[in-house]
Structures are given as structure tokens and as C-alpha cells.
């Protein structure tokens, strides 16, 4: 891509196909907070606040009796035998997270990103322009125009092979960049119309399968 090429034209409001893409089932979640006696203002059975590993769903889970739960722990919530989680009780919003869960969120997201390295390296290699004047990369923290063009030029010369390769060639920590974007998408309720990784909100969503955008209403 030549610098400035994707900016040609004056149509900033491209039309996105409307689509309600089925959500993928979460197999793993990460523990954000563990409340052995329920919420302080409403004592109840033990509650775990967690984050889905792939779709980054915020959820409330009920642990099995007499199990040890640690902050930042990865727990299985898929089909079949579960070691620590009895069931997922409900989905929750960012505002419903405890102060502890909010403080743990970025660090937990970073761990989830690290073990999905292939997914996010592919994102850096293939993410497209959104409109004639805006590229997906510009939505990432710390990137902006300067690093956007550096990433585009580097990936055209040779695809990124790993997080380490990206950091050595770009000079930025890719795990933190992705994690901060996910944290922003989770916390900015109705303030952000583009969602790259949090698929369950309404807005313009990136379909990572084919790297195109669709409108979810």
C-alpha cells in the first residue's frame, strides 16, 4: 500500500452489512475476582467474576463447593467435566465489576492475549482499512498515523511471525496494545462505535474470520 492510498475518496461513511453473527462458545474464563460470601451488600453463595477468553465476555460464575480460586486463574467453563466452576450464572456489564475485578482486568486480558498469539499476530498482518479515511490500526492505543504506516510497510515487506518479531521491528509491545484496546472496548459503554475484539456489543464489529466489518444492531 502506498502512503495515503486508502484515504482517497470522500466517502467517510461506508455502508456495513447488517449481521448478527453467532457467538462462539467460551471454553475458558479468567478469574477477575472471587467473593466467597457473595457481594457485600447482598450476601449470597460464592461468586466468581470472570472474563471469557475468546470473546471477552464479562460473566458471573458459581464455583463448585470446597475449591480454591485464585485471582488471574484460568478456569474451564466448556462442555463436559469442569474442575472448579459449577456453572455460569449470567453475563454482566463493566459497571457491575467489583473494584478488584476492574483493577485486575488489564493484567488478565494481557494473559489471555498472550496465549492467543497466532490470532493477534494474524490481526496485525491482515487488519484492513475501515473507511476511506480510517484504518483499523489507528484504533489501537499508542499507534496513530506514524506507527500505523510503519506496521503497514513492515507487514508488506514481510509478515510478522510472532509478538517478539513485532516488538523488535515496530518498537511497541503488541500484547499491551491489544489488551488496552480490549479494556477500552469493555469499559466504554456506547461510547465507541467500532469493536475489534469484543463481539457481543452493538456497533461496527470486525469479523476476524475474513477481516471485514459488519453492523450489529
Curated annotation (Swiss-Prot):
One Pfam family hit: DUF655
InterPro entries, per the entry: DUF655 (IPR007003), NA-bd_OB-fold (IPR012340)
Protein name, entry field: Uncharacterized protein MJ0038
